[in-house]
């Protein structure tokens, strides 16, 4: 049995068309949803500056903070992870009197002053390194998510020293 070149080309085009349709349907079916190992939210972190306005009613700390590296991730299974390296006061490169931090996750609108959740507190090492890993309860819907890294005091989380975002 021999297949003409015309029939072979037609068969290959049909297979390609069916494959494209299957892949597009599969991609469309998961739009707006995330696979088990995906991420719902991820961002870099930036230190605060004196010009920062309150975010969700939380004031920035009284002095600027910088960091070498910072990331935050939230998975669809509720796994929250925040890492900071070198989160220190801009003026002197130390953590000053700050020894503990927490991370608050907020959703819009900005007038919402109650976080969806707060993770931590965890120790902030003298070199400004810290890591928070927690399983959290996810909000059912979240628009414009923002994470604030906050000074943890005896009364709970206070001012923010870093937030989700970037600098150029």
Residue spans for each PLM region:
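Bacterial N-terminal signal peptides that target proteins for export
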Residues: 2-12
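Bacterial N-terminal signal peptides
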Residues: 12-22
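Sec/Tat signal peptide C-region and signal peptidase I cleavage site
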Residues: 23-29
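Transition segment at domain starts
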Residues: 31-76
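Short amphipathic, basic-aromatic surface patches that mediate peripheral association
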Residues: 86-94
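Short coil-to-beta strand junction motifs in C2/discoidin
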Residues: 94-102
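Helix-rich interaction surfaces within compact, conserved domain-sized segments
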Residues: 112-168
